[in-house]
């Protein structure tokens, strides 16, 4: 292999080594006034999709007010995770609906 090609192969392999991980989409179902699953672990950059199967509007609202997602009846809403931490959340309209989102780097 010539020196030019060796360098090109090394750069290509280095790019594969440092390529960012593929972001995941994680689904949470809302049905009968319950978030399922009640605890989700995800990574920064992942997307959470709340799929509301109920006939009423819900929210997914972080208890620390970092985010608030409104989910219309029979619709889905999403949130891209931008910050690591443990986030307890609830529905503003139905405060007994509670869940936890653990976001890692």
Q: At which residue positions do the language-model features occur?
A:
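Extracytoplasmic copper-binding redox domains, predominantly the cupredoxin/blue-copper superfamily
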Residues: 2-4, 13, 18-105
């Amino acid at each position: 292999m010539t020196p030019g090609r060796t360098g090109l192969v090394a750069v290509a392999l280095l790019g594969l080594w440092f390529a960012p991980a593929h972001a995941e989409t994680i689904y949470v179902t809302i049905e009968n006034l319950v978030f399922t699953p009640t605890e989700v672990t995800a990574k920064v950059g992942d997307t959470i999709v709340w799929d509301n199967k109920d006939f009423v509007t819900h929210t997914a609202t972080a208890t620390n007010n970092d985010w608030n997602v409104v989910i219309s009846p029979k619709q889905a809403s999403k949130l891209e995770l931008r910050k690591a931490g443990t986030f307890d959340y609830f529905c503003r309209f139905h405060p007994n609906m509670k869940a936890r989102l653990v976001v890692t780097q």
